[in-house]
């Protein structure tokens, strides 16, 4: 590194040998008082960390900077102090509208000595009295007064309304279920358990309903069979004849004795009208007079085809439509399709049960005993 010249070295030493000319700015006396005031203000505002031993810079701008900082800090301190003191905001409460309940409340429900309270207090009081519960008097407002024989006029609400709807039904069933000395009380006592439908319990009301339907069906059948024609007049069957019925259904239907025995069995199954309809169709085929054919066809239609008849037979819609179109000009064969359908029904459904019935077996036993005695 090249060395400095002698002139430069002398100038350098002369420059550094001069006394320092920097001006030492001392803080004025009023800044110390301001420092004390700032410390007291921060402590009074409740700040957790007070500023102790604040040192001012030795500059003319230090007081201005300090005043700005102290003002800002004191403002923040006041702001956070207010936030800590303020309670958290609450969610807005939803007000109920009890205006519909107020007209239903009688003035007598209010306790004596209480006057009408205006405004919100009156609304709350009326709403509380309208709710179901026990009032301070110790008696429900809708309870029947035993001494006066009168009940309150407050309308029932909620589940109480459902209970009141059930009471008339239960009251109507109690005389038949609980009256002593009547026949069938043992069976009906358990039938009053409930009268409302419930999907999770099995109630004996269904059993009572089925028994009632069977009783009505039996009564209706007995009423409609009062005007039925009597059985065909025929001699009693022989053992060989009765045994031939088991060979085929046609052999059973060919003999009057077989038809009478089969008709008696159908009567026990409440389906005697099938045999009567088949026999009426056979009688219609024997007629030759047009007026007689029309009259008998009309009678057969009203007795066995019409949906209003208690002796209606079971036919499909196609056969019914064919008969309805042909009733304008009926003929002897107007019911052939319906007769064949009923014949097939008796053959497939009733005939096998007749062969296994006690009626047919008893008939064979009695005929066998007569044959042995002879």
UniProtKB/Swiss-Prot annotation:
Chain residue ranges for the region called Disordered: 1-21, 135-158
CDD domains: RGS_RGS20
GO BP of this protein: negative regulation of signal transduction
Pfam family, one: RGS
Coiled-coil parts of chain: none
Polar residues compositional bias, start-end: 1-11
Disulfide bonds: none
Subcellular location: Membrane; Nucleus; Cytoplasm
Occurrences of domain RGS (ranges): 248-364
Topology of this chain in the membrane: Lipid-anchor
Keyword annotations: Cytoplasm, Glycoprotein, Lipoprotein, Membrane, Nucleus, Palmitate, Phosphoprotein, Signal transduction inhibitor, Ubl conjugation
InterPro entries attached to this UniProt entry: RGS, RGS_sf, RGS_subdomain_2
Reported modifications of this chain: Fatty acylated. Heavily palmitoylated in the cysteine string motif.
SUPFAM superfamilies: Regulator of G-protein signaling, RGS
Assembly with partners or alone: Forms a complex with G(alpha)z/i2 subunits and mu-opioid receptors; the formation of this complex results in mu-opioid receptor desensitization. Interacts with OPRM1.
Purpose: Inhibits signal transduction by increasing the GTPase activity of G protein alpha subunits thereby driving them into their inactive GDP-bound form. Binds selectively to G(z)-alpha and G(alpha)-i2 subunits, accelerates their GTPase activity and regulates their signaling activities. The G(z)-alpha activity is inhibited by the phosphorylation and palmitoylation of the G-protein. Negatively regulates mu-opioid receptor-mediated activation of the G-proteins.
UniProt protein name: Regulator of G-protein signaling 20
Species name: Bos taurus (Bovine)
Lineage: Eukaryota, Metazoa, Chordata, Craniata, Vertebrata
């Amino acid at each position: 590194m090249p060395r400095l010249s002698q002139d430069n070295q002398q100038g350098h030493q002369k420059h550094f040998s001069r006394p320092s000319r920097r001006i030492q700015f001392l803080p004025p006396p009023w800044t110390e008082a301001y420092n004390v005031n700032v410390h007291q203000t921060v402590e009074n505002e409740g700040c957790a960390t007070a500023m102790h031993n604040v040192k001012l810079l030795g500059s003319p701008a230090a007081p201005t900077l300090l005043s700005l900082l102290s003002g800002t800090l004191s403002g923040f301190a006041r702001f956070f102090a207010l936030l800590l003191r303020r309670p958290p905001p609450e969610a807005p409460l939803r007000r109920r509208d009890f205006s519909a309940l107020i007209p239903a409340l009688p003035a007598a429900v209010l306790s004596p000595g209480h006057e009408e309270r205006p405004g919100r207090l009156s609304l709350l009081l009326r709403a509380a009295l309208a709710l179901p519960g026990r009032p301070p008097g110790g008696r429900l407002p809708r309870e029947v007064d035993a001494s006066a024989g009168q009940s309150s006029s407050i309308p029932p609400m909620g589940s109480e309304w459902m209970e009141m709807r059930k009471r008339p039904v239960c009251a109507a069933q109690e005389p038949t279920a609980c009256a002593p000395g009547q026949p069938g009380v043992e069976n009906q006592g358990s039938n009053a358990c409930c009268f409302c439908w419930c999907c999770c319990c099995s109630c004996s009301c269904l059993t009572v309903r089925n028994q009632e339907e069977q009783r009505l069906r039996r009564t209706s059948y007995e009423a409609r069979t009062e005007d039925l024609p009597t059985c065909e007049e025929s001699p009693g069957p022989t053992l060989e004849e009765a045994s031939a019925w088991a060979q085929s259904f046609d052999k059973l239907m060919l003999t009057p004795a077989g038809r009478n025995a089969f008709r008696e069995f159908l009567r026990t199954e409440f389906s005697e009208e099938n045999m009567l309809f088949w026999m009426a169709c056979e009688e219609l085929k024997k007629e030759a007079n047009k007026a007689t054919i029309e009259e008998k066809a009309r009678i057969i239609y009203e007795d066995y085809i019409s949906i209003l008849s208690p002796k209606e037979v079971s036919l499909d819609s196609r056969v019914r439509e064919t008969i309805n179109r042909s009733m304008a000009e009926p003929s002897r064969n107007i019911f052939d399709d319906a007769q064949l359908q009923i014949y097939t029904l008796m053959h497939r459904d009733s005939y096998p049960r007749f062969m296994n019935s006690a009626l047919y077996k008893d008939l064979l036993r009695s005929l066998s005993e007569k044959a042995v005695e002879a």
